From Swiss-Prot:
Stated role: NDH-1 shuttles electrons from NAD(P)H, via FMN and iron-sulfur (Fe-S) centers, to quinones in the respiratory chain. The immediate electron acceptor for the enzyme in this species is believed to be plastoquinone. Couples the redox reaction to proton translocation (for every two electrons transferred, four hydrogen ions are translocated across the cytoplasmic membrane), and thus conserves the redox energy in a proton gradient.
Enzyme Commission numbers on file: 7.1.1.-
Disulphide bridges, residue numbers: none
Location of this chain's protein in the cell: Cellular thylakoid membrane
Gene Ontology cellular component terms for the protein in this record: plasma membrane-derived thylakoid membrane
Catalytic activity entry: a plastoquinone + NADH + (n+1) H(+)(in) = a plastoquinol + NAD(+) + n H(+)(out); a plastoquinone + NADPH + (n+1) H(+)(in) = a plastoquinol + NADP(+) + n H(+)(out)
The name this protein goes by in its record: NAD(P)H-quinone oxidoreductase chain 4 1
Enzyme class: translocase
NCBIfam families the UniProt entry points to: NDH_I_M, PRK12561.1
InterPro entries on file: NADH_Q_OxRdtase_chain4, NADH_Q_OxRdtase_chainM/4, NADH_UbQ_OxRdtase, ND/Mrp_TM
Membrane topology: Multi-pass membrane protein
GO molecular function terms attached to this record: NADH dehydrogenase (ubiquinone) activity; ubiquinone binding
Length: 538
């Protein structure tokens, strides 16, 4: 009899939504009611299976890969079905399960092609799970690409008036970025005496400096589109502005996290030598994301576009955390991803609830609806408070950890750290201004003459209340007791930070901060000096 710990849990978790999606066309259903219950049931069952497997068999104190499965799939091209989970991927798997399940529940009123809609949702769910557990570069790329097609169709069919433009822009950006994954991956796989696509093996290989730097840059571009990083972000406001509420929940809650996860897994963990050179660039890009995203959010009159630019700003903290080279900074980056996934999903869902009542996303055409929708107003306010990192909410903990991480880092000069912290703080100050302004325009004051409400405007319904509460409760829980989530990945982030620090320069008795400052201010160092900066001090 098979020991349950040896059961292929990850394969089952990935395959369940995909196989269930393939069965949707044969389900007898005329009005779409059976299909939506079926989709919700499958998503919930998969999420429950995930929780049960991790609860019983996952070792939270270990930084090693667990639930390891590896089978030759297409040996002719070196493609293996190689999956595993560790502290970095496990919390993001749980986030993916929660967001996708709630997004399907949020799509309860979809009547246009319901079979296709729920089928695409389940296929996308399966591919997202595959991205977070893939341990073969080709498998990772396959899952990354499969996920693009459902997102494109969900936007182009069930989106807003400019849905085709937004969907086309999304697919062009992300498909073009995927080329960089393939090129960088092949450069690493074929470098050296052995050819391998195993991610762990790729991390142990020695690469010529030029190949490693170019591969890092390629991954940075590819994953920077998904995160997104300025100036590769312009697809996101359009996609959010036109996507349905469930689509926006998944875009903000899961898709952006795929970019952050991949940056940690590939750029920082697999290519630590190149990370030495790119870390200050990540810090600068993080600051730009924060300030630029906050400033652009001010200029938006569309509610969803304002939230989209807010997401760009919040993802800047992930970049700064990775650049800090500290355990608390990397841990804060992971926590920020989980927190933002929950917060953004709640705000985009509540925006959909508001749009359903007001039939507009333009804030200058709203106003005063807090009087007729007090429960929605209260829930939206709670989500906004979480987004502006109010103490007691998860966002506060994540951002604070990133700030402490970069401020206490010993790899940068004091002046560089001061500039990063101060400019990031400017973005933090701007966040409550544009979020509170958003609340005022939508819920306070008098109703706009251009707002044409139905004769009866219902407040938040039980289904909508359940979805929002399912997102807000973990936000508050993590804010009050961060160890609730950090204990699942602390061992892994400590290992990643320590591994990355091994290649930091400690040469001729000099401190890392002085040499790092030398790299940053004098990029044309002699070749011998550059070589010494990336070697471990003996």
């Amino acid at each position: 009899m098979m020991n349950l710990i040896e059961f292929p849990w990850l394969t089952a978790i990935i395959a369940l939504p995909l196989v269930a999606a393939l069965a949707i066309p044969i389900i007898p259903d005329k009005e779409g009611k059976t299909v939506r219950w079926y989709g919700l049931g499958v998503a919930f069952a998969d999420f429950a299976l995930m929780i049960a497997a991790f609860w019983h068999y996952y070792d939270f104190q270990s930084s090693s890969y667990q639930f390891v499965e590896k089978y030759a799939w297409v040996p002719q091209i070196g493609l293996n079905w190689s999956v595993a989970v560790d502290g970095l991927s496990m919390p993001l798997l749980l986030l993916t399960g929660l967001i996708n399940t709630l997004a399907i529940f949020a799509a309860w009123k979809v009547t246009n092609k319901p079979r296709l809609f729920y089928g695409l949702m389940l296929v996308m769910y399966s591919a997202q799970l595959g991205v977070f557990v893939a341990q073969d570069l080709l498998l990772f790329f396959l899952m990354w690409e499969i996920e693009l097609v459902p997102v494109y169709l969900l936007i182009s069919i069930w989106g807003g008036p400019k849905r085709r433009y937004a969907a086309t822009k999304f697919i062009l950006y992300t498909a073009a970025a995927s080329i960089f994954i393939l090129v960088a991956g092949f450069a690493l796989a074929f470098s050296g005496d052995t050819v391998t696509f195993d991610i762990a093996a790729l991390g142990m290989k020695e690469y010529p400096k030029a190949i490693e730097l170019l591969a890092y840059a390629g991954f940075l571009i590819a994953f920077g589109v998904k995160l997104p990083i300025f100036p590769l972000h312009t697809w996101l406001p359009d996609a959010h502005g036109e996507a349905s509420a469930p689509g926006s929940m998944i875009l903000a809650g899961v898709l952006l996290k795929m970019g952050g996860y991949a940056l940690i897994r590939f750029n920082m963990e697999m290519l630590p030598d190149a990370h030495v050179y790119f870390a200050p660039v990540l810090a600068i890009l993080g600051v730009v994301n924060i300030v630029y995203g906050a400033c652009c959010a001010f200029a938006q009159t569309n509610l969803k576009r304002r939230l989209a630019y807010s997401s760009i700003a919040h993802m800047g903290f992930v970049l700064i955390g990775l650049a800090s080279y500290t355990e608390i900074g990397v841990s804060g980056a992971v926590l920020q991803m989980v927190s933002h996934g929950l917060v953004a999903a709640s705000l985009f869902f509540l925006t959909g609830v508001t749009y359903e009542r007001t039939h507009t996303l333009l804030m200058d055409k709203m106003g005063g609806i807090g009087k007729i929708m007090p429960k929605t107003f209260a829930l939206y306010t709670a989500g906004a408070m979480a987004s502006l990192a109010l103490p007691g909410m998860s966002g506060f903990v994540g951002e604070l950890m990133v700030f402490i991480g970069i401020a206490t880092s010993d790899v940068y000069s004091s002046s560089f750290k001061v500039v990063v912290v101060l400019l990031s703080a400017v973005g933090v100050i701007l966040t409550p201004i544009y979020l509170l302004s958003m609340l005022r325009q939508v819920f306070y004051g008098k109703q706009s003459d251009e707002l044409h409400l139905d004769a009866f405007v219902p407040d938040v319904k039980p289904r909508e209340l359940f979805i929002t509460a399912s997102l807000l409760l973990p936000i508050i829980g993590i804010g009050l007791y961060p160890k609730l989530i950090t204990q699942t990945y602390d061992a892994k982030t400590v290992e990643i930070a320590a591994h990355a620090r091994q290649v930091l320069p400690v040469v001729a008795g000099q401190q890392p901060s002085s040499l790092y400052s030398q790299i940053f201010t004098a990029p044309t160092l002699a070749n011998a000096q550059v070589e010494s900066l990336v070697n471990i001090s003996k």
